[in-house]
């Protein structure tokens, strides 16, 4: 039976199963009913559209006027050569967003992706076939390889070409070959009404599936950040997360859990100290200044607090002091009510 709640459960489980260098299964759970597809579908779209990759954007072949031309000594016509070329998956070796690369082949030869590897670019699908030339052929071409996202048709690329001898190419930048998701039922705290999202990501080898998934997440965060300018949701979420983390520590437990001597406990109780976190928030001088707290009790409290990982006056709470203070005040108000 589902309990009445005032907010959706935040998933806590996440796994990545690397099936190969180019395939991974990414799972997260438990989601409330309906939340799985709400998040999985846009992530899938972003995997295709926002993941950065490389592609040839233009080519000039010596002796060739246009893509429907033919070339002496090459088995393929130029159109088929370009189709094969677009199947090659390039990586630029430098930090540059663009490389102009020259290639030259002579004599009888079958040309594969591995034959285009040089100091500027790498072809990740090395065994992909490109062309066959005979002993009379001299195949010389210049290729522009660029970094980008998504897909840009040749008509748009043509507008940016300054050299008319280059043939514009359809540019398939995305390194994600396939992204699919499944929404599975999952049992959580004896409740079967939760969902598990399983994303299967396949890349072409330019990047790993994990890198592609990270890129998609970053793109989603950036797109949603425009709404945060007014709502300040990220700050609220951070504070809520920190509050949840505090609840999982000893800081919000009663000082009775410290097993103090009766003298030390009675002194703290009379001073109004209820929670362990109050001791962590105090400085040593503040603690020593409590009425009737002797040196023996002071040393006892200091030693016990050090043993649980939160020494008196600890700096570990630097960013969370106000959150802890507010949480303790809230708990005290509830107890008084």
UniProtKB/Swiss-Prot annotation:
Enzyme nomenclature, EC number: 2.7.7.6
Organism superkingdom: Bacteria
CDD domains xrefs: RNAP_alpha_NTD
GO CC annotations, alphabetized: cytoplasm; DNA-directed RNA polymerase complex
Spans annotated as Alpha N-terminal domain (alpha-NTD): 1-231
Assigned keywords, A-Z: DNA-directed RNA polymerase, Nucleotidyltransferase, Transcription, Transferase
Database matches in InterPro entries: DNA-dir_RNA_pol_insert (IPR011262), DNA-dir_RNA_pol_RpoA/D/Rpb3 (IPR011263), DNA-dir_RpoA (IPR011773), RBP11-like (IPR036603), RNAP_asu_C (IPR011260), RNApol_insert_sf (IPR036643)
Coiled-coil ranges (or none): none
Reactions the enzyme catalyzes: RNA(n) + a ribonucleoside 5'-triphosphate = RNA(n+1) + diphosphate
GO BP of this protein: DNA-templated transcription
Keyword set includes Nucleotidyltransferase: yes
Region listing for Alpha C-terminal domain (alpha-CTD), in residue ranges: 248-337
Gene Ontology molecular function, alphabetical: DNA binding; DNA-directed RNA polymerase activity; protein dimerization activity
Subunit-level organization: Homodimer. The RNAP catalytic core consists of 2 alpha, 1 beta, 1 beta' and 1 omega subunit. When a sigma factor is associated with the core the holoenzyme is formed, which can initiate transcription.
Family of the protein in this entry: Belongs to the RNA polymerase alpha chain family.
Domain remark from Swiss-Prot or TrEMBL: The N-terminal domain is essential for RNAP assembly and basal transcription, whereas the C-terminal domain is involved in interaction with transcriptional regulators and with upstream promoter elements.
Family matches, as NCBIfam families: PRK05182.2-3, PRK05182.2-5, rpoA
Protein function: DNA-dependent RNA polymerase catalyzes the transcription of DNA into RNA using the four ribonucleoside triphosphates as substrates.
Name listed for the protein in its UniProt record: DNA-directed RNA polymerase subunit alpha
């Amino acid at each position: 039976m589902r309990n009445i709640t005032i907010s959706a459960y935040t998933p806590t489980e996440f796994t990545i199963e690397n099936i190969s260098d180019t395939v991974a299964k990414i799972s997260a759970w438990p989601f409330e009913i309906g939340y799985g597809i709400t998040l999985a579908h846009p992530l899938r779209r972003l995997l295709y559209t926002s993941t950065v990759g490389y592609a040839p954007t233009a080519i000039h072949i010596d002796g060739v006027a246009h893509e429907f031309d033919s070339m002496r000594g090459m088995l393929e016509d130029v159109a088929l050569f370009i189709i094969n070329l677009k199947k090659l998956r390039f990586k630029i070796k430098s930090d540059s967003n663009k490389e102009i690369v020259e290639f030259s082949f002579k004599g009888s030869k079958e040309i594969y992706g591995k034959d285009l590897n040089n100091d500027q670019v790498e072809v990740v699908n090395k065994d992909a076939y490109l062309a066959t030339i005979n002993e009379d052929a001299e195949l010389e071409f210049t290729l522009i390889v660029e970094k980008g996202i998504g897909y840009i048709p040749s008509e748009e690329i043509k507008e940016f070409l300054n050299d008319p001898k280059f043939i514009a190419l359809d540019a398939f930048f995305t390194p994600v070959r396939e992204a699919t998701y499944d929404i599975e039922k999952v049992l959580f705290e004896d409740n079967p009404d939760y969902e598990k999202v399983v994303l299967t990501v396949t890349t072409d080898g330019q990047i790993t599936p994990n890198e592609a998934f990270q890129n998609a997440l970053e793109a989603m965060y950036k797109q949603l950040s425009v709404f945060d300018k007014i709502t300040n949701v990220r700050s609220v979420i951070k504070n809520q997360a920190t509050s949840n983390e505090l609840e999982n520590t000893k800081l919000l437990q009663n000082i009775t859990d410290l097993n103090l001597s009766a003298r030390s406990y009675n002194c703290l109780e009379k001073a109004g100290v209820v929670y362990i976190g109050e001791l962590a928030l105090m400085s040593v001088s503040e603690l020593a200044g409590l009425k009737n707290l002797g040196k023996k009790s002071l040393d006892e409290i200091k030693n016990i607090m050090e043993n649980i990982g939160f020494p008196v006056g600890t700096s570990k709470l630097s960013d969370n002091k106000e959150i802890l203070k507010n949480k303790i005040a809230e708990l005290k108000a509830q107890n008084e009510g």
